[in-house]
């Protein structure tokens, strides 16, 4: 994309306070004219440097730190100080910085969030604000909000209930909305709904920043969520995107089903994970040379991620011509009690859909040997669940077994890339949820494991939805997104073991996703932004956030010389 000219931005701020506004601050990149006219001359050292040099300075500071948690704090402090520079740093090397601002480091940051909290980066709305949520929203300084990421902190990554400390997730997620998708950060709002926590360690921690009582559940919880959705949509408009993040299984599906046709909303753990997993499967099919409807897919896990993927796989198989009933027969799920089969006790409605006539089995190794899947997908956050025997069996059943260890963070991965490639002698088609280093095999080949990161999905979806004012987001959007992502994977990438485009191309991938969403939205009469733009790519691209510093001096321009004459005498 061509670099844009600096945007002119009006501000009444002057002096010291301007240097404390992260939206306006340029640090040492302020020109001499700006320093003098904005009354900040003398507050900064006399050196004037470019943003490129500023990025280099941050990277050098970043690299001298010894822990990822300290690197996370460095970047968050930068975000609080100079927003443009923060995003310029992230975009300079997305592959390097994404694991710090999001998975896996954000998991550690959430565990330590009571220590990491510096200043407000979003809104904390507690159950005790019920009846006054509209007033709490008024505390946020921005009047125009187009995207909200909200969590109640009950199921943070694979770490469980972190309560109020889960705020690190919406903050990190929205940072990627901008870095990877170009959504304007000033139009993004992270929100944590604090209804308490079941985490005993947090309840006893004197430094914990959230409510110190058990989670509120039932009708009171539902009424609280209803009020929040109504208040947010009322204040920011029905087109405001509200993304649900890291809600527990008991709430995730029912809240999605409850709100999806009433508000502009989606659940990334269900739909985003599904989209990126299906994108990986579609890319893998170019290696196996067969169709998705030819696969037998076994899931280790039957929570929101597994069920979300399963439903989208069914939709993709239907698109290939298979009936929904026959597509479901090709999908098997394993939860904490074993294989999901008909007649098994205490199956939820969501799990019942994928229950088949089969004997009950509990051991995953035995289940793999019995089902003989062509694709094995782990989303249960059980580290090491894919044992050496399971990997050997997958390689015995299949010439090119598809093995996805998608659980986060790294410690929860079902197997490592090295284990998978070594045991299967490089025949496995592997993807993971967290990043793994390249693996060199005994035969000299080096394979680059694909990272099935949701950040391939949600930034582009958000950009497209916001750009055209899509009122509701159905599952078709996520199948379309999966197809677009898989199309960006070249044959060379596949030969290297990659099932996803390189992360350093993610902004371009997000643009393609957004353009496709916008095209479909106008074609299906679902867009609300009019008049319809003729060139959809130009339209979307023009709305993407630029890290170029804004021009904040007043607009100065000349008048004709004759009208500038100074009158010195009173006309007689």
UniProtKB/Swiss-Prot annotation:
The record marks 269 as: Important for activity. Its EC number is 1.1.1.40. InterPro entries: Aminoacid_DH-like_N_sf, Malic_enzyme_CS, Malic_N_dom, Malic_N_dom_sf, Malic_NAD-bd, Malic_OxRdtase, NAD(P)-bd_dom_sf. The modification Phosphoserine is found at residue 336. Divalent metal cations. Prefers magnesium or manganese. The active site is at residues 102, 173. GO terms for molecular function: identical protein binding; magnesium ion binding; malate dehydrogenase (decarboxylating) (NADP+) activity; malic enzyme activity; manganese ion binding; NAD binding; oxaloacetate decarboxylase activity. It catalyses: (S)-malate + NADP(+) = pyruvate + CO2 + NADPH; oxaloacetate + H(+) = pyruvate + CO2. Keywords: Acetylation, Cytoplasm, Metal-binding, NADP, Oxidoreductase, Phosphoprotein. Catalyzes the oxidative decarboxylation of (S)-malate in the presence of NADP(+) and divalent metal ions, and decarboxylation of oxaloacetate. Belongs to the malic enzymes family. PANTHER family: MALIC ENZYME-RELATED (PTHR23406), NADP-DEPENDENT MALIC ENZYME (PTHR23406:SF17). This is NADP-dependent malic enzyme. It comes from Mus musculus (Mouse).
């Amino acid at each position: 994309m061509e670099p844009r000219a600096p945007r002119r931005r009006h501000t009444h701020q002057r002096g010291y306070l301007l240097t404390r506004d992260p939206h306006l601050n340029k640090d040492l990149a302020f020109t001499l004219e700006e320093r003098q006219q904005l009354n900040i001359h003398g507050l900064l050292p006399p050196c004037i440097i470019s943003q490129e040099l500023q990025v280099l300075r941050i990277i050098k500071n970043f690299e001298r730190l010894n822990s990822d948690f300290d690197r996370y704090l460095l970047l968050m402090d930068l975000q609080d100080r100079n927003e443009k520079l923060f995003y310029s740093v992230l975009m300079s090397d997305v592959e390097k910085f994404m694991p710090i601002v999001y998975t896996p480091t954000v998991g550690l940051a959430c565990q330590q969030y009571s220590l990491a909290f510096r200043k407000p980066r979003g809104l904390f709305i507690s159950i005790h604000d019920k009846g006054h949520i509209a007033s709490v929203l008024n505390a946020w300084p921005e009047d125009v909000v187009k995207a909200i990421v909200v969590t109640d902190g009950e199921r943070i990554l694979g770490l469980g209930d972190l309560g109020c400390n889960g705020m690190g997730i919406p903050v990190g997620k929205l940072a990627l909305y901008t870095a990877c998708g170009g959504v304007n950060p000033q139009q993004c709002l992270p929100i944590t709904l604090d209804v308490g926590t079941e985490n005993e360690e947090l309840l006893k921690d004197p430094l914990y920043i959230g409510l110190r009582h058990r989670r509120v559940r039932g009708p009171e919880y539902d009424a609280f969520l209803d009020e929040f959705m109504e208040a947010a949509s009322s204040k920011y408009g029905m087109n405001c995107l509200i993304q649900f993040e890291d809600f527990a299984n008991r709430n995730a599906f029912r809240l999605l089903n409850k709100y999806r046709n009433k508000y502009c909303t989606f659940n990334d753990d269900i739909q985003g994970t599904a989209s990126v997993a299906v994108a990986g499967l579609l890319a893998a099919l170019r290696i196996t040379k067969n169709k998705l409807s030819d696969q037998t897919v076994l899931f280790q896990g039957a929570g929101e991620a597994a069920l979300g993927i399963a439903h989208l796989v069914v939709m993709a198989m239907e698109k290939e011509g298979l009936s929904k009933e026959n597509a479901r027969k090709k999908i098997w799920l394993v939860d904490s009690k074993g294989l999901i089969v008909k007649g098994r006790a205490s199956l939820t409605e969501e799990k019942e859909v994928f229950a088949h006539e089969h004997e009950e089995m509990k051991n995953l190794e035995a289940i793999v040997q019995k089902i003989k899947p062509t694709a094995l997908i782990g989303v249960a956050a059980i580290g090491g669940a894919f044992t050496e025997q399971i990997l050997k069996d997958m390689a015995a059943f299949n010439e090119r077994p598809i093995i996805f260890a998608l659980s986060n963070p790294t410690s929860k991965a079902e197997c490592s890339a090295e284990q998978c490639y070594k045991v299967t002698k490089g025949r496995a088609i592997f993807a993971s949820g967290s990043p793994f280093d390249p693996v060199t095999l005994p035969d000299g080949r080096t394979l680059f494991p694909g990272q099935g990161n949701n950040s391939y999905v949600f930034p582009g979806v958000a950009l497209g939805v916001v750009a055209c004012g899509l009122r509701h987001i159905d599952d078709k959007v996520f199948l379309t997104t999966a197809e677009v992502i898989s199309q960006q994977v070249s044959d060379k990438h596949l030969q290297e073991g990659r099932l996803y485009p390189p992360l350093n191309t993610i902004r371009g991938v997000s643009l393609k996703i957004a353009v496709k969403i916008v095209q479909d939205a106008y074609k299906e009469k679902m867009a609300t932004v009019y008049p319809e733009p003729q060139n959809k790519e130009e339209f979307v691209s023009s709305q993407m956030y630029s890290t170029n510093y804004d021009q904040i001096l007043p607009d100065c321009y000349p008048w004709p010389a004759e009208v500038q004459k100074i009158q010195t005498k009173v006309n007689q």
